[in-house]
C-alpha cells in the first residue's frame, strides 16, 4: 500500500486484523502518515537508495511530463516538484519492486469512478497496464 488517507488506511486496518505480516507500506518519505505505520513492514523510497538507473525507475515507459518530474526527484530532491515526484517514484517501486520488495502480480485500486484512471491512482494503473499486471477497482471488487 502507498499509505494514502482514506481507502488505503481502511484496507490496511482490515488486513492488519487478520494478517499484519502481509502489510507492506511503501512510503514517499520516512514519516509519511506515521501513525498508520505501527506494527507493519514499512520502507520509504529514501531508504531504498534508488538512482535514476534503478530498474524500478528507468523501466517505466513514461510520458515526457512524468519523466521530467522523476528526473527532478533525483536532480533537485528538495524542490516542490521532487516532493510531488516522490509519490510517483513510490508507485513505481510498488509496481516494479526494488531490493526486498518484490514486484506486484496484481493490484486493487479505489478509483474515482466518475473520472477513472486520473492522478496518482491512474498513473499506477497505467504502469500495471503497461506490464500486463491485472488490476481491479471497486467497480469489480466492491460488488
Residue locations for each model-derived region?
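Acidic/glycine-enriched connector segments
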Residues: 1-142
Amino acid at each position: 500500500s502507498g499509505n494514502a488517507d482514506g481507502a488505503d488506511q481502511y484496507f490496511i486496518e482490515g488486513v492488519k486484523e487478520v494478517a499484519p505480516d502481509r502489510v507492506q507500506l511503501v512510503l514517499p518519505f520516512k514519516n509519511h502518515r506515521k501513525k498508520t505505520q505501527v506494527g507493519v513492514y514499512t520502507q520509504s523510497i529514501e531508504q531504498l537508495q534508488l538512482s535514476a538507473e534503478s530498474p524500478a525507475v528507468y523501466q517505466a515507459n513514461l510520458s515526457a511530463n512524468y519523466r521530467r518530474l522523476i528526473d527532478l526527484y533525483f536532480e533537485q530532491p528538495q524542490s516542490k516538484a521532487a516532493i510531488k515526484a516522490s509519490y510517483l517514484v513510490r508507485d513505481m517501486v510498488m509496481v516494479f519492486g526494488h531490493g526486498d520488495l518484490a514486484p506486484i502480480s496484481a493490484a486493487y485500486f479505489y478509483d474515482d469512478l466518475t473520472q477513472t484512471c486520473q492522478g496518482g491512482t491512474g498513473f499506477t494503473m497505467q504502469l500495471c497496464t503497461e506490464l500486463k499486471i491485472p488490476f481491479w477497482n471497486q467497480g469489480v471488487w466492491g460488488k
